[in-house]
Amino acid sequence: MSHRFDNLPDLFNLPLKPNFSCELDLQKQGFFHIAGVDEVGRGPLAGPVVTAAVILDKDHVPDGLNDSKKLSAQRRNELYCEILQSALAVSIASLCARTIDQSDIRKATLEAMRRCVTGLAIPAHYALIDGRDIPFQLPCPATALIKGDQHSVSIAAASIIAKVTRDRMMKCAGQIYKNYGLEKHVGYATLAHRIALDKYGPVVGLHRYSFAPLKGRFRDNMS
């Protein structure tokens, strides 16, 4: 289900920081519980893709919400706690490396987005999705916004929740798989990570065998 509202943001005139204008436009049209949806982890060689959906309370929006990539780790963690305390609803979903390999990263990301919107404790009346694509079978109408985390505070909040959640998951994985430095690069294709892969090979269930440079070099024998 998709929907386009009248006053889409100007993608060539990004605000200095995300704001609540998209949400206010939708509320004027009768959509009150608006979920911002974002993902983290499309590109890494290891770990899950994580998505989050956040419905903010318009009267209690945390100060300083921004694209998670523009915030320090400390500030992300602070805002993570503030969002969980003040938001009307927060939902998180993830899909593992093996599921990504069996499908593809785009399909896995959209499915995780669908799951997190569906999993909100308060049903969303509308969803603002970061990116170009709208997941199939959402329980509400939706609009995809390119660079949405730079337009919408709801999407920015979702990006922070997803980023902090995934980083923590990868740091935990780093305590188990100590040879890969996961707590530092959280699965991305850094030089240190690629060197570790050359030396130790990938971990079944952790690494994405369908991604270069693993594809064609290694085989998931449990698939």
From Swiss-Prot:
Q: What is its EC number?
A: 3.1.26.4
Report domain RNase H type-2 positions. 32-223
Q: What keywords is this UniProt entry annotated with?
A: Cytoplasm, Endonuclease, Hydrolase, Manganese, Metal-binding, Nuclease
Primary place of residence?
cytoplasm
User: Which cofactor does the UniProt annotation name?
Assistant: Mn(2+); Mg(2+)
Q: Where in the cell is it found?
A: Cytoplasm
Spell out the GO cellular component terms annotated for this protein, sorted alphabetically and separated by semicolons.
cytoplasm; ribonuclease H2 complex
The record, for Gene3D superfamilies, names:
Ribonuclease H-like superfamily/Ribonuclease H (3.30.420.10)
Biological-process GO terms, alphabetical: DNA replication, removal of RNA primer; mismatch repair
Looking up InterPro entries in the UniProt record yields: RNase_HII (IPR022898), RNase_HII/HIII (IPR001352), RNase_HII/HIII_dom (IPR024567), RNaseH-like_sf (IPR012337), RNaseH_sf (IPR036397)
The UniProt GO MF terms for this protein read: manganese ion binding; RNA binding; RNA-DNA hybrid ribonuclease activity
Binding of a divalent metal cation occurs at 38-39, 130
Catalytic reaction(s) noted: Endonucleolytic cleavage to 5'-phosphomonoester
Which CDD domains does the entry link to? Answer: RNase_HII_bacteria_HII_like (cd07182)
Q: How is the cofactor bound?
A: Manganese or magnesium. Binds 1 divalent metal ion per monomer in the absence of substrate. May bind a second metal ion after substrate binding.
* Record's keyword annotation contains Cell membrane: no
Q: Which NCBIfam families match?
A: PRK00015.1-3
- Biological role stated in the UniProt entry: Endonuclease that specifically degrades the RNA of RNA-DNA hybrids.
Q: What family is this?
A: Belongs to the RNase HII family.
PANTHER family in the cross-refs: RIBONUCLEASE H2 SUBUNIT A, RIBONUCLEASE HII
Q: What is this protein called?
A: Ribonuclease HII
